[in-house]
Amino acid sequence: MAPSKWDDEEDSSSPPPPPVVARRKFDDEEEEDVLDSWDAAEDSEVEREKAAKAAAAAAKAEAEAAAKKKSKAQRIEEHKQERKKQAEANESDEDSDEDEAARRARLRRTEKEGDLKHAQDLFDDIDLNRNRGAPKAIVISDSADPTQAVDLSAMPLFKPTTKDQFTRLTTTLIPLLTAHSKKPHYALWAQEFTKQLVKELNSGDVKKIASALTTISNEKMREERAADKGNKKTKAAKTKVSLVASRDNKIDATPYDDDGLDDDDFM
């Protein structure tokens, strides 16, 4: 009997390959691999941080170098643009009912304040307050009662602008100051006071004031010389009168009894 077809197929089929047994990793070997991967990740993170810091430092250095190369006009323009953006940002937060005129006034005021602050930052060696002519507050307080104080700079008398106002200031101060002219330190004080008064004037105005003082000095010298001559004449006249008076009032004490004549000579 011929073998069945099924038997032939079974005989012709090859046996399956043996299973591949994977090598088992030890516990410590697996942990070492994990640690190595962590260390590598940490190293890469540190490198990235270092690279980011280096890039930031380089960008900052470039920005500083570029800023140094910019002129003052460019820096002022940049500040203006920044202030304009800030003002526009603040404008969005303001009340929507603000009218156009008020908004423009506020923007102009903000720009002026910013310009002044920036000018003070750039030219801090210039006394802007003095150039504006704003007087400093001069507060005089009572030593007995410190709460009683007066700001002289706020009084209209000390803020003259016209010729009449300056004349009024002069007529007010002169009597108060010249009342101390007989005191020992008045002359020295007047010299220093005059220097301080003309300190802010130009040389031409100072020369005119010096010429006026020279004229006053010459007039004083003539008055003093005339007074000295008058005193000398008066003194000489008094001396002459006293001599004549003393001569007239002299008593004649000559004895006339002993004249060498006897009474018999007349008989």
From Swiss-Prot:
GO terms for cellular component: eukaryotic 43S preinitiation complex; eukaryotic 48S preinitiation complex; eukaryotic translation initiation factor 3 complex. Pfam families: eIF3_subunit (PF08597). Residues 74-88, 108-121, 220-231 have a biased composition (Basic and acidic residues). InterPro entries: eIF3-like_dom_sf, eIF3j. GO terms for molecular function: translation initiation factor activity. Keywords: Coiled coil, Cytoplasm, Initiation factor, Protein biosynthesis. Residues 44-96 form a coiled coil. Residues 28-46, 90-100 have a biased composition (Acidic residues). It is found in: Cytoplasm. It comes from the Eukaryota. Residues 1-128, 220-241 are annotated as: Disordered. One of its GO terms (biological process) is formation of cytoplasmic translation initiation complex. Belongs to the eIF-3 subunit J family. HAMAP family: eIF3j. Component of the eukaryotic translation initiation factor 3 (eIF-3) complex, which is involved in protein synthesis of a specialized repertoire of mRNAs and, together with other initiation factors, stimulates binding of mRNA and methionyl-tRNAi to the 40S ribosome. The eIF-3 complex specifically targets and initiates translation of a subset of mRNAs involved in cell proliferation. Component of the eukaryotic translation initiation factor 3 (eIF-3) complex. This is Eukaryotic translation initiation factor 3 subunit J. It comes from Neosartorya fischeri (strain ATCC 1020 / DSM 3700 / CBS 544.65 / FGSC A1164 / JCM 1740 / NRRL 181 / WB 181). The gene is hcr1.
